[in-house]
Amino acid sequence: MRLAAIDIGTNASRLLISEVTVNGEGVPTFSKLNLIRVPLRLGFDVFETGEISKEKKHMILQTMKAYAHLMNAYGVEKSIAVATSAMRDARNRDEVVRKIFLETGINIKVISGDFEASLIYESHVAENLNANNNYLYVDVGGGSTELTFFSNNALVYKHSFKIGTIRLLKNMVTDADWQEMKEALRDNLRGQKNTIAIGTGGNINKIFSLSKKKDGKPLHIDLLKDYYKEFSSCTVEDRIRLYNLRPDRADVIVPALMIYLQIMKWGNMEEMLVPKIGLADGLVQHLYAEATA
C-alpha cells in the first residue's frame, strides 16, 4: 500500500510518500519512497499581518499542484493533508483551503496543536525505548512547540505552546508564554527521574546531522549549548557558508536551539534523542491505522 502525508507547517511544507509492507504476523513496515520539502515560510506573513498574502497563496497552490502530480506518479492509494500553526492563525485560511481543494483535489485539515502533539507520538518511537524511563517529546516548529510527556509508556500530558522559531524571530513570544511552558514542565515533571527528551523538527534533525553522532545516540545538553553559542556568534550568511545551512534553516536554527535548551533546563534533562521523524511520519502511521481499522 502506498500512502502520502502532506504537512503544511509555519516554515515549510512537506510531502512524504511511503510504501507500507506487512509481514506474516501482520506487522507493518513503513519505507520512505520520497520526501519533498518546500520552504513556504507562511509564518512571516501570518504572524505580521494575520493572513496569508497573495504571493504566498500562489506559492502554496503551486506546491500542492506539484504534490498532486507526484502522488499520481507514485500511485498513492490514500493521502492526508494537514496544516498547523500559521494556517490556524490565518484569517483567510478557509478561502485558501477551499481554493486548493477546488484546483488540486487535496483536502487540507487545519489541525489543533494538541492533535499535532498526538500525531508526533503516532511515529511509535517509544515502542523501541526503555519502559523504565520517562520521555518528553519536544516538537519545535515555526509557530508552536508541542510537548508530550510519557511515563511507563502511558501518556501523562500533552500541550501545544505558541512558542515557535518564527514567532521568536518576530519578537512575538511574551514572558507570559515562557512562564506558561516553565510551569507546565515543573508541574508535570516534578519528582520524575530518568526523563529523556526526544527532539523532533527540522532544526534538531540538522543539529544531529552536524554532530556526526550515530543513529540512536543522544545529544548532550552541553553540545547543544556549544552549537547555540557558535551559531549565535555568527551572522545568518556565515551560518550558510560555514555550516552549509539552507537560508530558511540558517535564521531559525538559533531560536530553535533556544527553545530546546530552555525545555531541557526546566525539565532537568541532560540528553536528547533525535529519531529524525516528524509530523509527516506520524500522519502516515495515522492514515494506515485508519485504513486498516
Tell what function each PLM region has.
Residues 27-44, 72:
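Conserved ATP-binding subdomain of kinase catalytic cores across diverse folds
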Residues 17-19, 35, 95:
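A general secondary-structure boundary signal
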Residues 45-74, 78-134, 149-293:
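Helical "lid/coupling" subdomains associated with nucleotide-phosphate turnover
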Residues 1-30, 124-161, 202:
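Gly/Thr-rich phosphate-binding beta-strand-loop-beta motif of the actin/hexokinase/Hsp70
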